[in-house]
Protein backbone atom coordinates (compact mmCIF):
# COMPACT_ATOMS: atom_id res chain seq x y z
CA UNK A 1 0.00 0.00 0.00
CA UNK A 2 1.19 3.52 -0.75
CA UNK A 3 -0.04 7.06 -0.19
CA UNK A 4 0.63 10.57 -1.42
CA UNK A 5 0.84 13.04 1.46
CA UNK A 6 1.32 16.81 1.61
CA UNK A 7 3.66 18.45 4.10
CA UNK A 8 5.78 21.58 3.90
CA UNK A 9 4.17 22.58 0.59
CA UNK A 10 5.44 19.42 -1.15
CA UNK A 11 3.89 16.08 -2.09
CA UNK A 12 5.57 12.78 -1.24
CA UNK A 13 4.72 9.26 -2.40
CA UNK A 14 5.34 6.98 0.59
CA UNK A 15 5.03 3.32 1.53
CA UNK A 16 5.36 1.62 4.89
CA UNK A 17 8.97 1.33 6.09
CA UNK A 18 10.30 4.12 3.86
CA UNK A 19 12.62 6.80 5.23
CA UNK A 20 12.51 10.31 3.84
CA UNK A 21 13.57 13.88 4.55
CA UNK A 22 10.84 16.50 4.74
CA UNK A 23 10.80 20.21 5.55
CA UNK A 24 11.57 20.88 9.22
CA UNK A 25 8.80 20.17 11.73
CA UNK A 26 8.91 21.33 15.36
CA UNK A 27 8.68 17.85 16.95
CA UNK A 28 10.85 15.82 19.31
CA UNK A 29 13.17 13.11 17.97
CA UNK A 30 11.62 9.69 18.62
CA UNK A 31 8.03 10.93 18.70
CA UNK A 32 5.18 9.77 16.47
CA UNK A 33 3.51 12.20 14.07
CA UNK A 34 0.31 11.83 12.06
CA UNK A 35 -0.31 13.29 8.61
CA UNK A 36 -3.99 13.86 7.75
CA UNK A 37 -3.63 15.65 4.41
CA UNK A 38 -3.60 12.58 2.12
CA UNK A 39 -4.28 13.08 -1.61
CA UNK A 40 -4.15 9.47 -2.82
CA UNK A 41 -4.17 5.92 -1.49
CA UNK A 42 -3.24 2.96 -3.64
CA UNK A 43 -3.00 -0.81 -3.20
CA UNK A 44 -3.71 -4.00 -5.15
CA UNK A 45 -7.49 -3.29 -5.09
CA UNK A 46 -7.19 0.07 -6.80
CA UNK A 47 -6.69 3.74 -6.15
CA UNK A 48 -8.63 6.26 -4.04
CA UNK A 49 -8.27 9.88 -5.11
CA UNK A 50 -9.50 13.08 -3.57
CA UNK A 51 -8.53 16.37 -2.03
CA UNK A 52 -7.70 15.43 1.59
CA UNK A 53 -9.26 11.94 1.78
CA UNK A 54 -11.51 11.53 4.82
CA UNK A 55 -10.40 8.87 7.29
CA UNK A 56 -7.00 8.45 5.65
CA UNK A 57 -3.86 9.03 7.70
CA UNK A 58 -0.15 8.26 7.60
CA UNK A 59 1.81 7.80 10.83
CA UNK A 60 5.55 8.24 11.03
CA UNK A 61 8.36 8.16 13.59
CA UNK A 62 10.81 11.06 13.76
CA UNK A 63 14.36 9.74 13.34
CA UNK A 64 16.41 12.94 13.37
CA UNK A 65 16.55 16.67 12.80
CA UNK A 66 19.36 18.15 10.73
CA UNK A 67 20.63 20.43 8.02
CA UNK A 68 21.17 19.52 4.39
CA UNK A 69 24.37 20.04 2.42
CA UNK A 70 25.25 23.63 1.57
CA UNK A 71 23.84 25.06 -1.63
CA UNK A 72 26.15 27.71 -3.06
CA UNK A 73 24.77 30.70 -4.90
CA UNK A 74 26.96 32.96 -7.06
CA UNK A 75 25.76 36.16 -8.72
CA UNK A 76 28.10 38.11 -10.95
CA UNK A 77 28.12 40.83 -13.55
CA UNK A 78 30.33 40.10 -16.50
CA UNK A 79 33.20 42.48 -17.21
CA UNK A 80 32.44 44.57 -14.08
CA UNK A 81 34.58 42.83 -11.42
CA UNK A 82 31.47 42.29 -9.33
CA UNK A 83 30.69 38.94 -7.72
CA UNK A 84 28.49 37.99 -4.78
CA UNK A 85 28.81 34.59 -3.12
CA UNK A 86 26.19 33.20 -0.79
CA UNK A 87 25.42 29.86 0.83
CA UNK A 88 22.38 28.24 2.39
CA UNK A 89 21.73 25.07 4.40
CA UNK A 90 18.09 23.97 4.64
CA UNK A 91 16.76 22.42 7.86
CA UNK A 92 15.02 19.04 7.54
CA UNK A 93 13.29 16.35 9.59
CA UNK A 94 14.02 12.72 8.76
CA UNK A 95 11.06 10.37 9.28
CA UNK A 96 10.22 6.69 8.85
CA UNK A 97 6.71 5.72 7.76
CA UNK A 98 5.21 3.31 10.31
CA UNK A 99 1.64 2.96 9.08
CA UNK A 100 -0.89 3.88 6.41
CA UNK A 101 -4.60 3.80 7.29
CA UNK A 102 -7.54 4.54 5.10
Swiss-Prot record:
This protein binds to 23S rRNA in the presence of protein L20. Part of the 50S ribosomal subunit. Contacts protein L20. InterPro entries: bL21-like, bL21-like_sf, Ribosomal_bL21, Ribosomal_bL21_CS. It holds the Pfam family Ribosomal_L21p. GO terms for molecular function: rRNA binding; structural constituent of ribosome. NCBIfam families: L21. The gene is rplU. GO terms for biological process: translation. It comes from the Bacteria. It comes from Stenotrophomonas maltophilia (strain K279a). The keyword Zinc does not apply. This is Large ribosomal subunit protein bL21. Belongs to the bacterial ribosomal protein bL21 family. The keyword Electron transport does not apply. Keywords: Ribonucleoprotein, Ribosomal protein, RNA-binding, rRNA-binding. One of its GO terms (cellular component) is cytoplasm.
Amino acid sequence: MYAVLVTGGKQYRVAQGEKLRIEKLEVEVGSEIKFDNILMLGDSDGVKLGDALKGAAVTAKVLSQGRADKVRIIKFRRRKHHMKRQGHRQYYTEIEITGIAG
